[in-house]
Amino acid sequence: MQGCKHIIGISILALANFAFQGCETPPEPTPTADFAHQLAPGECALRKLGPDEAWPDLTGAWKSRDAYLQEALAQDQTWYESPSSRSRFPQMFPFPDVCTWDQASSSIIAFRQILNDNADQAAFTSAFKQMFDCWQTKGWNGKGGVLFTGYFSPEFKASLTKVPGFEFPVYKRPKDLETDPVTGKAIGRRVSESEVVPWPSRAEINSSGMLKGLELAWFPTALDAYIVQINGSAKLLLPGGKVMFIGYAGATDGEYVGLGASLVKEGMIPANQLNLTAIRRLYEKDPATVEKMIDLNNRFVFFQNYDGKTWPAGSLGVKVTDKVTVATDKSVYPPGGLMFVDTQASTYSGSKQPFQRFMLDQDTGGAIRAPGRADIFMGIGPSAEILAGGQYCEGTLYYFFLKPEYVSQYPLPAKKAKAPAAGKTG
């Protein structure tokens, strides 16, 4: 969302700001782990593996390559072909020793070709290691430690007008919302040509009527409307079978406070039972209390219509792909980067299994604000919600970029000029 004004799905950690119950036997990340640990100013989150250091075993990634990976690579290439991608290097990823825009984009082209040209793992691995450098994350502990949670994209029943059963709105972007034109980060509320002030609290915004007339869609409950705000985009199922898509259009500068963390702190839901279903059940039983906790989150999100062709889209503005797209902190990790993720993933039964895949860094999220955090996109709808809700496992990740001497050999394909209209000449 940040940057391209589209966003992600519901991050289980973003909704809670607290990890939801993981696998059947809850995983045991390091007890003293500080996954929110921040790097020193100007420090790079990645370290290049030296010539004598062993690469990760890519066997699992090779075996798990599939049509989803190919689709995600195509989406990545589409993003690199857009002019806006160039502005991310080095302005938002100021580490040219890791990769430049040319290097990052060429890496995707080269990787796609290597995948297509090599039918066996040995040949692929040989070519891959010859042409690419491997960079491991420092993670939260300087040793590569990363907490992997999950997110998904839901569908919501909604109405374009306020009617019985649909009385809780989300709003269009107000004209006085001031945001950074490059990063999309909230600055405040412009009250005059020379003055920008902080936005009021969530409770004040809702009670004051200051957004009256900007209602974009109405939802059955305050919790639904809030989840849409946390999600940042939504597919709306309207009366009569119509479908509408809404996406992120900005947010206020208020402090983000996770609903789940608030509920656990107040003793309303035990930490080891925290998930979206538990929050919904509590809301059905005691909506006033949950709404009070919602009001503690003063980051208020605004929306706009969009055509849905790229839904669900990540922060790069391209469609995210099940179990291939990863959301990371884009202030420390390279957007669009080719990755290898080594962790465990939750199954529908709640058990866990090894998860080793080539993936792509195509998204970000409100709770993903450190090198020791990453969110895996699990898909759309209720089934994906189950996987996202159970995903809470530690692991590590690596990025791969072409060695400089190969970059010029793998440029983005030149765009074909459009043919002139019939009867016209240039």
Predicted regions located by residue number:
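Bacterial N-terminal signal peptides that target proteins for export
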Residues: 1-8
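Short amphipathic alpha-helical segments with coiled-coil-like heptad repeat character
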Residues: 2, 81-84, 341-347
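Sec-dependent N-terminal signal peptides
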Residues: 8-14
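C-terminal motif of bacterial Sec signal peptides marking the signal peptidase cleavage site
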Residues: 19-22
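Bacterial signal peptide processing site
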Residues: 24-27
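C-terminal segment of N-terminal export signals and the immediately downstream linker at the start
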Residues: 29-33, 37
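Secretory/export targeting leaders with adjacent low-complexity proregions
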Residues: 37-307, 314-318
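C-terminal soluble interaction/assembly domains
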Residues: 308-426
